[in-house]
């Protein structure tokens, strides 16, 4: 933990990082190839840099200088960061729209035989926050993509249903399905993790699924923050008289019940990879609506004010203990993990994304003459 010597906030958006961590891990550790290009949502920058650190593409010194001069950037930046940032991202959803136009440009260069030798066609990917759907340029890009029949494009929505402005409207997901479907996208909803899917097949399972589907976003977030006893109280009250309810609740202690009720697909690696594999096609753009929890696994999870919140030193100490990371091991790549370090190193060396070295390609410079000659005529028009 870096001290705040002047009392000002130091650190990023921890809750936003937590909601996107599994999605980014699935992308960079499995789904992506070196030729793919990704726009990472700006508030998930620390997760991106951590993945690059694991892959040996980021230094400890720059990580420790996060948000400081010369350190890794709070928003991914192609000009200020030194690692594999494909698109600079920031406010108003510009990174999201850029991926769509990058896909169109790639199609153009291929169609005109202008792709450089040895450069393979890649997929364009954007990991976006649900609040980025408030930005008009995202919808302008959607319409342009429909006009040009864009393909080979993934937009992954980190649907944690919380933003700086408050809790997302209950029915936003239906609108997402409508307007993406209207633009000829394939919409894939990732809502339930494998534990919840298994519970739905057991005692009171159908009633449990209906309760989750009907639970308002603000209540779900509040229960996520309060934990197991709060889940139990609400389920007992709301599902009173449901056959099998006692059997369902009695089979989980408070911690286990909380784990079950927060098992959303956006935090379930198996569910995410299944969806990515099933959508591995180029001819149609793909929209993944991944249900997540803002602050997942943190003491801030679900809290209404967690957008820019930071864990206190005491909370961070408890978090490190929970993750089995001892003092002094914070920068050990495999701290807290029970797997053999050699196996983990071998895995990282075989990650498809990192299979080749340099991912940046420099185009030849276009010569610009010192002076543009013009031929004056008696009559000229400004309209062409």
Outline where the language-model segments fall.
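Phosphate/oxyanion-binding active-site loops and adjacent basic polyanion-contact surfaces
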Residues: 15-20, 90-98, 134, 261-272, ...
